[in-house]
């Protein structure tokens, strides 16, 4: 960014504040739109990893992990500000987590999620399936 070392913490706080403010506004606008037709019951985030970026030795990879952590944290805070429960799920263990919570085999859940996408026009790839399963888990936890 070109900021001097002494300015870096101040710049980081300012930029983090901007990200959090924009995220809160965006989530509030989305909730306003959705709540006209239905009630949003929670937020489920599917992430690649929850590893502490400080443990990553490679600067480039650590920067990406910090960016992911920033946006994940901003969305979690925005959900709390909107009084919505928020859960974060790791993608690579998503089906195992769901199998444990639903007390059903992961293979049965994969089939059920695949079936959910049959009437959907457009893509129903891994991202859409993960989002559907995460939403299912969130709905289960709020009931």
Predicted features along the sequence, with ranges:
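Phosphate- and other anionic-substrate recognition elements at nucleic-acid/protein interfaces
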Residues: 1-143
């Amino acid at each position: 960014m070109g900021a001097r070392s002494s300015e870096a913490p101040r710049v980081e706080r300012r930029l983090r504040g901007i990200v959090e403010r924009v995220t809160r506004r965006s989530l509030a606008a989305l909730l306003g739109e959705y709540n006209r037709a239905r009630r949003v019951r929670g937020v489920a985030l599917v992430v690649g990893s929850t590893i502490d970026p400080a443990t990553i030795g490679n600067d480039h990879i650590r920067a990406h992990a910090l960016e992911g952590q920033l946006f994940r944290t901003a969305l979690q805070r925005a959900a709390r500000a909107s009084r919505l429960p928020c859960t974060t799920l790791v993608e690579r263990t998503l089906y195992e987590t769901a199998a444990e919570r639903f007390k059903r085999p992961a293979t049965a859940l994969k089939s059920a999620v695949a079936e959910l996408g049959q009437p959907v026009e457009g893509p129903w790839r891994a991202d859409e399936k993960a989002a559907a399963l995460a939403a299912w888990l969130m709905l289960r936890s709020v009931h």
